[in-house]
């Protein structure tokens, strides 16, 4: 039954590939939906520790962010203004505390903003090819880390957060992502004659995804361990929730966007 659930979950996740291929407004629409669902999971998880995030503010910020066409300066003005407003909420309504204000903003930054980097990479020049680095980097890291850990794992990586992860698995994941992302660049360049940037950048992006996607996984695990839950939700049968499946991708997305924006330009 558990295996059947995982297959069902895989079928539910499969359309994401189609949206990646379509790109544009289709991918943006998917990212908005995933952001809202992920933020709901995050806020709901924190309620287990008796936090009371002001959820409506977080959802509003996500919608406003996309309506402003992902304008960073506009959304920062909105975040500062709404934080200013929310800081007054605990004064007039003792149901909320200043910590609730903090986790409300944290949820938007962690889930809403990080999800948006997938869309922001996609709308760059050659973005229809570059966006795959986010997913390939994350998926290969996860797969290579699993098998490397299974074959060679002896030293625990972060036992208090994720007891099953090993240092050897972590290294294997990073190496795997570096190689596969580099090969992806070579295939684009030599196989399809699509030149985007020097090949070494693909290897570097792969290495960075290999490192930071694992941090994304560990951050999500540490939150779950802190609030005492196994999965963020059971939205995807056999796979947990949106944040369970996209935790590493959130960190890869930021890394790929920042590297392309500030290093490659």
Where are these regions (language model features)?
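Juxtamembrane boundary at the C-terminal end of a transmembrane helix
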Residues: 258-265
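C-terminal transmembrane helix pair
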Residues: 224, 249-257
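Juxtamembrane interface at the ends
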Residues: 145-146, 221-229
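Interfacial loop-to-transmembrane junctions
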Residues: 225-248
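Hydrophobic transmembrane alpha-helices of multi-pass small-molecule transporters
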Residues: 14, 177-178, 245, 252-253, ...
